């Protein structure tokens, strides 16, 4: 009887240890897939964005390495073009599910663009699929995909066409065309507010516009009035339009609440 009772206690202890181990693994599951001592380096940042958890996604200046960094500065993962997930990443955003979307560009003969696409990665940086693909005109050096906006379960991306800008929503499987004159030659990049269905764009000559149905788009910013200003990437959030000014090394902030 005593031997049997002792055996029961051993089984109970083993079960308790097993349960504790499982709980510890579950509680520290993110840590288990993270090496907090692993260094990460990049010479310069080509593009960066954040998510709702405070994580930062960085594309280095080679456009061939992407890093996910936690809010407290830990490297969660990194993926490289050599892993065959992408070719040359130019933009990165993360949706509400943690999936990551890259604006991927295939370049030939130094600067000529052969094709572009939107590549979807998992929350761990692993390739899932290519959700969009755009063939470029022969000899083209200008991008056709000109912006991305994350949604809860997907991404909205903006693409230049002959008649204007096509805004596509992968979550809803829908698209909408905005008629913008000479979009192929004029537009550098775009931002989109899905709540108000508003499109904003930066032109190659340094102007920022808001699209209007009238055909006369509203001028919001003119770099000719600010010495040295060169607006580039733009994004929209809560009534404010932001643009990275690579000439002044500053952020242009345009409040649109009154517009």
Task: Give the positions of each predicted feature.
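Repeated scaffold domains used in trafficking and secretory/extracellular systems
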Residues: 44-47, 87-92, 142-148, 184-192, ...
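Residue-level detector of Asp-centered blade-edge/turn motifs that repeat once per structural unit
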Residues: 50-53, 94-97, 150-153, 193-196, ...
């Amino acid at each position: 009887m005593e031997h049997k009772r002792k055996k029961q206690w051993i089984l109970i202890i083993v079960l308790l240890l097993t349960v504790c181990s499982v709980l510890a693994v579950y509680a520290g599951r993110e840590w288990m897939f993270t090496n907090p001592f692993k260094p990460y380096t990049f010479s310069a940042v080509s593009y960066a964005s954040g998510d709702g958890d405070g994580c930062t996604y960085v594309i280095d200046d080679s456009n061939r390495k992407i890093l996910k960094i936690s809010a407290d500065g830990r490297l969660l993962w990194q993926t490289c073009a050599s892993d065959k997930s992408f070719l040359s990443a130019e933009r990165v955003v993360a949706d509400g599910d943690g999936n990551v979307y890259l604006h991927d560009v295939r370049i030939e003969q130094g600067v000529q663009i052969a094709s572009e696409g939107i590549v979807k990665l998992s929350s761990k940086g692993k390739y899932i699929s290519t959700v969009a693909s755009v063939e470029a005109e022969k000899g083209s050096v200008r991008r056709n995909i000109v912006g991305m906006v994350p949604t809860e379960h997907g991404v909205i991306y903006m693409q230049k066409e002959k008649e204007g800008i096509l805004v596509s929503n992968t979550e809803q499987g829908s698209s909408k065309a905005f008629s913008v004159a000479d979009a192929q030659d004029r537009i550098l990049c775009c931002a989109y507010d899905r709540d108000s269905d508003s499109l904003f764009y930066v032109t190659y000559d340094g102007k920022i516009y808001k699209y209007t149905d009238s055909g006369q788009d509203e001028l919001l910013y003119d770099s000719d009035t600010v010495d040295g200003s060169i607006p580039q990437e733009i994004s929209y959030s809560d009534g404010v339009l932001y643009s990275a000014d690579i000439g002044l090394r500053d952020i242009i902030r345009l409040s649109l609440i009154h517009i």
